Amino acid sequence: MLNKIKTLQGYKLSGLDGEIGKVKEFYFDDKHWTIRYLVADTGNWLTGRQVLISPYALVAVIKEEQHIIINLTKKQIEKSPSLDNDKPVSRQFEETYYTYYGWPMYWGGPYMWGTYPYIVRDRDKWIKANKLGKTWDPHLRSTHDVNGHDIQATDGEIGHVDDFIIDSETWAIRYLIIDTLNWWPGKKVLVSPRWIDRISWSESKVFINLSRETIKQSPEYSEDSLITRDYENELHRHYNKPGYWVDDLADTVLPS
């Protein structure tokens, strides 16, 4: 299911033994464009530290009740490796964090989730997963910080990042919502991270290998409507790009 980040912000987080807080923001990596951590606002509990929840612990998003189910207890979260509010998420912290929970490390292979292109819940496969694959160095970004970044087409600016649309099964970022208000009023469009050429973090700018006119003529995105596969097919046909679901299908040939 596809969900907007801004919609998920404020959702209650329901652990195995009660509510632990609400969704504050997310961290994603800029290689696979996949959510790596949900950042929880725990109120007066666990103050002074970032409470990070990996998608391995996210069981389901219940939109009707505006909450996310987590398969962790409060004690597990409280005893987890601590990261101060003003500290970045380092590789050393991630290794300690993943070791604590016993999850396979997502940077341990070529796919979105290491040895696999999706989150594997079978613990028997986790030990093998951690022994396979070439590791890579993740660079994590905050969805809150990237909001507002300018979008640079091949022939000029077209707007800015307004939000992200994620797939709550794989926790991949499927689209960036681009607000083109400063260029042509009243229209928002979707752009896949796969179409991004590069990102200048120092300039807060995202470079896309598409022209402004091509983007302008793309199927309009309405925040009031659900994103259907028919709409996605139309969008990808317009840009003459293969859908992410094609690659996802190819990636299902996995190590046994």
Q: Model-derived features: where do they sit?
A:
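Peripheral interaction segments used for macromolecular assembly
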Residues: 1-256
